[in-house]
Amino acid sequence: MEDDSLYLGGEWQFNHFSKLTSSRPDAAFAEIQRTSLPEKSPLSCETRVDLCDDLAPVARQLAPREKPPLSSRRPAAVGAGLQNMGNTCYVNASLQCLTYKPPLANYMLFREHSQTCHRHKGCMLCTMQAHITRALHIPGHVIQPSQALAAGFHRGKQEDAHEFLMFTVDAMRKACLPGHKQVDRHSKDTTLIHQIFGGYWRSQIKCLHCHGISDTFDPYLDIALDIQAAQSVQQALEQLVKPEELNGENAYHCGVCLQRAPASKTLTLHNSAKVLILVLKRFPDVTGNKIAKNVQYPECLDMQPYMSQQNTGPLVYVLYAVLVHAGWSCHNGHYSSYVKAQEGQWYKMDDAEVTASSITSVLSQQAYVLFYIQKSEWERHSESVSRGREPRALGVEDTDRRATQGELKRDHPCLQAPELDEHLVERATQESTLDHWKFLQEQNKTKPEFNVRRVEGTVPPDVLVIHQSKYKCRMKNHHPEQQSSLLNLSSTTPTDQESMNTGTLASLRGRTRRSKGKNKHSKRALLVCQ
């Protein structure tokens, strides 16, 4: 069930949206995705839902429609490397994966949002637009990511790359909503971010006594895959959509026959995203131990077997980015990424170093997060690049492909980021801090019967939760070259309370990886014993 393209005939097509209706007029979509701020849905899992092709009218259409000029289209070659500012490899790896996401990058280069944005300060879409535009148009250089990109998240310690990635995506989603409280939830699903990353789960329960069917639909922005018993991404997806029998103590209370009866429950993808973010759950529990086994993933992935509607032809996705964590546990390690430039060449992005790679090398990594895009989307964006390529002062073809950005930096001095307005960091921190985001997430998320990411965990009673991250950062000496921090926002040393409440970027040493678990339903806490 392949949707219309985001980009057709030189025009943006963010207006087509796969839609659902319910036999109940008050049915709505439960915002349960762990990377968004959920709102409780009145849609009952005991309500029979009929599917059709159209959704109830939305109050506002929030996606762009304009046609981008040729000069705004992205260059075909790889862009700049990113300077590690002290424990920020997780930021750099995540930003590189977002930068080379064709629908998002092309939209950012068009600069439509910043032309109409009224926030001016603290807007993640404007901040990402500036970063992506800068990174893609100065290949061969090394740049410093803006401090505002991690304001409210980075605390001078190594954080989880996937968590930062989805924190950023959610901040961009909010930036698409002018006047959050005045926008209905159906309109929220028409935003640029949701139409690029968003899809819907369909949980169907069939009563084996009366054969009544109940459907529940829940949005997602990423898909978490349990890899403990899987040897490949395809096996993990098969396990995810495998039918489950409900009987005995777990029998289903049917809303049709009003009896407690055996039932079958099936979870499928009703609407698949333009861009798939697949998270391999390598840190599944509170111990911090990493599942370090190799999990095979293909260059081309057919998602049709996991869709609600079958026999509609292949739904092929192509791999364009891989986020990698190197290390044996959550307590140490390093993040890097592999991205596919629009020219078709793969590159390894390791902070400031950018080196050409091959698909063979890419597919042999211990992947943490995989990024796939619908094949038709990739081909259309590649074609637009070949038609509208901009001249470049320095391209990858002008240098030895084996050279790293670190080597190029000697000939092309590192571009320093402009001084950041203190009010920008302060406002961004106040509007979207990590603790506040997670607190609202835990308070507001719904508890549907199907919970594909549940991992039980407990917190000892004799600890004080200071920061919602599972593990303390353990400083190592594996990277002495980073012992001198490059990022120092304040000459004063904050108190413990100030460190807890502010999201300012503090300077710490090393690239040591701090532990993280991947289940968003269990609390992530940095614990200090009382």
Curated annotation (Swiss-Prot):
Residues 382-410, 477-530 are annotated as: Disordered. The active site is at C89, H334. One of its GO terms (cellular component) is cytosol. Transmembrane segments: none annotated. Residues 510-524 have a biased composition (Basic residues). Residues 484-495 have a biased composition (Low complexity). GO terms for biological process: protein deubiquitination; proteolysis; regulation of apoptotic process; regulation of protein stability. It holds the Pfam family UCH. Deubiquitinating enzyme that removes conjugated ubiquitin from specific proteins to regulate different cellular processes that may include cell proliferation, progression through the cell cycle, apoptosis, cell migration, and the cellular response to viral infection. This is Ubiquitin carboxyl-terminal hydrolase 17-like protein 10. It comes from Homo sapiens. The gene is USP17L10.
